[in-house]
Amino acid sequence: MKLDLKILDARMRDYLPAYATTGSAGLDLRACLDAPVTLQPGETTLVPTGLAIHLADPGYAALILPRSGLGHKHGIVLGNLVGLIDSDYQGQLMVSTWNRGQTEFVLNPFERLAQLVIVPVVQAQFNIVDEFTESDRGEGGFGSTGRH
């Protein structure tokens, strides 16, 4: 799949999104910063990537997801948990960055911050009904199938 990528900050030409390994599902996104940013515990900031994409095809969307090492080792996760990039969005990719850890975290310019995953999308249409055809599960939810 080929995507249209617009470089909004010329410095990002050296830091294009890339798969870290041949089996990677996510493309690494980097922080397009002029100087280091310090996030205090509990603080959230919006970090630019210096890049924009246009998927164009409504059969696809992109997800911005956290990098597992930053979350596990430093408590750095996404403030909105998952960023959803619609196929018709053409603005800069931004990363809502939240320090849920107990210590301050310094984010350096061009550091890998998040990952971008392209996913297929089905746009559903609704069929209005008065009743559902009964299933084995019915309305059971929130633990109704047990833990083991």
Swiss-Prot record:
Recorded catalytic activity of this chain's protein: dUTP + H2O = dUMP + diphosphate + H(+)
InterPro entries in UniProt: dUTPase, dUTPase-like, dUTPase-like_sf, dUTPase_trimeric
GO molecular function: dUTP diphosphatase activity; magnesium ion binding
Swiss-Prot/TrEMBL keywords: Hydrolase, Magnesium, Metal-binding, Nucleotide metabolism
Pathway(s) served: Pyrimidine metabolism; dUMP biosynthesis; dUMP from dCTP (dUTP route): step 2/2
SUPFAM superfamilies in alphabetical order: dUTPase-like
CDD domains recorded: trimeric_dUTPase (cd07557)
Known cofactor(s): Mg(2+)
Name of the protein in its database record: Deoxyuridine 5'-triphosphate nucleotidohydrolase
Organism: Burkholderia cenocepacia (strain ATCC BAA-245 / DSM 16553 / LMG 16656 / NCTC 13227 / J2315 / CF5610)
Lineage: Bacteria, Pseudomonadati, Pseudomonadota, Betaproteobacteria, Burkholderiales
